[in-house]
Structures are given as structure tokens and as C-alpha cells.
Amino acid sequence: MYRICRLVCIIPITVSLLLFSCAYFNTFYNAERYYEEADRIRLEKSGKAIPLKAMDNYGKTIQKCRVVLSEFPESKLVNDAILLMAKAQFYRSEYDDAIGNLKIIYSKGSAKQIAEAQYWSAVCKWKKGKTQAALDELKDIIKSSDDSVIKAQCHLSLADISDELGRAEDFLFHLEEGAKQLKIGQKEESFTISSLTLHLIMRATR
């Protein structure tokens, strides 16, 4: 009888935990889905203004991430939600908000998350007109990070900045280095690698 009572007490707790887990995983999954769809639309129109549909999806990404942060602050996906939200804010030109969120990762994130946060902070500074600071930070990340995907992102952004500054040799150098890092990173199948590869192809055929 005692065991039955214990079982009856445990079942509601287990169900509640399962529902809680499903809720925040589902919310974050939807945030990722909106972000990936926004990125797909943006990359299809590369070189032009970001389409309204993509901007709308980036906005929905931010909304979903905020739900994760406010309703599930103890979940293991909090850092991922902060990073995803900051990336969406970058594409919506909300650079100060993105930088503010990325600073949270510096003290709470893993080494990989910190490197990614540093990357997005650097490109936010570039878009804010702090080009030299962005150049220095991107180069520092390349030196300090062991992550080939992060290094590829840095090189491709350095290529974009070099192109903007009219530095043809630097543009080609960083494009080639970005391609090398992507080749190393091909072992990791991810949406990030796919989008970076597409970005590289478009820059190389400009």
C-alpha cells in the first residue's frame, strides 16, 4: 500500500517535469526554426536589403527566446537562447541590445559560446562604425579559438570588412582562409556551416 501511495505521488511530479521540459524545448526549437528560415530568406537575397519576411522571422526568434529566458530561467538552453536572440538582433540592426546580451555569455558560457559571443560582438561593433575595433577583435578570436567554424566566420567577416575598405589582397586572403576552416569544419554537419558555405560561394563569385 505504501509503495502504491509513493507511486501515485511520484507520477504527477514526473508528468510535470516532462511537460516543463517539453515546453522549453519546443519554445527554443521554434525560435531556431524562425531564425533558420530568416537566414535562408536573407541569403537568397544577399547583397540587397534584408526582406521584410526575414526581418519578421528574426523578430519572432527574439520573442521566442525571451519566453525561454523569462519562463524557463533555469533551463540548460538559456545561454543558447541568449546567443540566438543576439544574432537575430544583429540582423535587425539592434546592435546595442545584441552587445548587451552577449556580455552575459562572457561570464556564464562555455568556451565555444564565449568565442561565438565575442564574434557577434565584434561584427556588431563593425556595423556601428567601430571598424578597427572589429578588425582587432576578429583577429584575436582567430588566434585564441580552436573552433574551425568560429574561425571561418571571423575570416569571412574580415573578408567583408576588407572588401568594404577596398583592400583586395586582404579580401582574397581571408576568403581563402575562411574556405580552409570550413573544409576542416565539414566534419560538423550544421546549419551554420551550410549558411557559411553559401556565403563563401557568393563572396567568391562577386
Across the structure, where does each feature detected by a protein language model lie?
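Bacterial N-terminal signal peptides that target proteins for export
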Residues: 1-12
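Acidic, polar-rich low-complexity tracts and alpha-helical solenoid repeat scaffolds
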Residues: 17-206
